[in-house]
């Protein structure tokens, strides 16, 4: 029920991966595909925890984003945790995706509490990390504002991370911030500086190389930029996102996020470097709109990037 015939990518040559049209009860992966901890940010359409896990495995995933929130029943959390364990699905991350620096103090308090609860959830289920963005000093929760780069913003970001980690008191996971083009941290050096400022052993790195590709230099020297990120951040990286970036021809510089294979980023080099850092490093496909798109581009990753 997961991969319809019409979702094959045109002109894909299948040399190593030969099970695209499997029956629903069969696996869609080969032994070689299962080496890397690929995953998606989508839970895919499902009715039970068991079906969720089975669908992920059939797609070729060995890592998942946990699909249950901290405010849901413990029985549901436990059922998904068990399903992941039974299918050797590494829980890569627990998402937060809220503005923990919101200007409204009541809203900020509610979001901070949610951050703590999500981090505790990550600790309970054994996820590699809980992940958020630093936050924005404007109406859009993840928006681009000059105020994001003030001294006050950095001070508040450091205090926010410390507060969340100190309150959660986790021992089995890490709190991470996804780097962004227009908020702290914007690059590997900035991330190292932030780690030093936060000074908490449960603060680590979430890698999104495309979010940090925010200049012509990083775009045109992408392999060197990947190497720099790997060298500076290395073992601190807990989970990675994968997508692509396209440079549009119109003035002025316009870097557009897109699906893997629709841009020019050296994704093979990126994936190889992350895998060298940790053979269990989760590589998570994100920002697609439908199950069909996740199926399509996961097959692209398996045949063109991992192969």
Question: What residue ranges belong to the model's regions?
Answer:
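Acidic/histidine-rich catalytic cores of soluble enzymes
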Residues: 94, 162-259, 264
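Active-site acidic/histidine proton-transfer and metal-coordination neighborhood
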Residues: 85-86, 105-205
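Intrinsically disordered, low-complexity proline-rich tandem-repeat tracts
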Residues: 2-4, 8-10, 14-16, 20
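A cross-taxon signal for low-complexity, glycine/charged-rich
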Residues: 13, 25-27
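Acidic-and-aromatic substrate-binding clefts and catalytic sites of carbohydrate-active enzymes
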Residues: 42-50, 66-78, 99-109, 138, ...
């Amino acid at each position: 029920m997961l991969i319809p015939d019409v979702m094959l990518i045109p002109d894909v040559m299948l040399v190593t991966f030969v099970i695209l049209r499997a029956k629903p009860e069969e696996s869609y992966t080969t032994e070689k595909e299962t080496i890397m901890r690929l995953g998606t940010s989508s839970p895919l359409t499902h009715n039970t925890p068991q079906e969720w896990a089975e669908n992920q495995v059939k797609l070729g995933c060995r890592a998942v984003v946990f699909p249950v929130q901290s405010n849901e029943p413990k029985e549901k959390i436990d059922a998904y945790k068990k399903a992941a364990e039974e299918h050797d699905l590494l829980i890569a991350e627990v998402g937060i995706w809220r503005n923990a620096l919101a200007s409204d103090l009541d809203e900020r308090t509610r979001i901070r509490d949610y951050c703590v609860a999500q981090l505790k959830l990550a600790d309970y289920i054994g996820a590699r990390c809980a992940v958020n963005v630093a936050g924005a000093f404007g109406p859009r929760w993840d928006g681009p504002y000059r105020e994001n780069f003030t001294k006050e913003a950095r001070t508040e970001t450091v205090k926010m991370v410390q507060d969340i980690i100190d309150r959660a008191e986790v021992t089995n996971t890490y709190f991470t911030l996804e780097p962004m083009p227009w908020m702290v941290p914007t690059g590997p050096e900035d991330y190292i500086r932030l780690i030093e400022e936060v000074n908490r052993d449960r603060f680590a790195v979430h890698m999104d190389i495309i979010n940090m590709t925010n200049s012509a230099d990083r775009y045109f020297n992408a392999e060197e930029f990947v190497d720099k990120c790997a060298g500076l951040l290395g073992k601190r990286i807990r989970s990675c996102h994968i997508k692509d970036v396209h440079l549009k021809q119109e003035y002025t510089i316009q870097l557009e996020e897109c699906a893997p294979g629709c841009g020019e980023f050296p994704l093979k080099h990126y994936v190889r470097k992350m895998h060298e850092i940790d053979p269990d490093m989760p590589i998570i496909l994100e920002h697609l709109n439908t199950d069909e798109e996740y199926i399509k581009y996961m097959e692209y990753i398996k045949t063109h990037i991992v192969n």
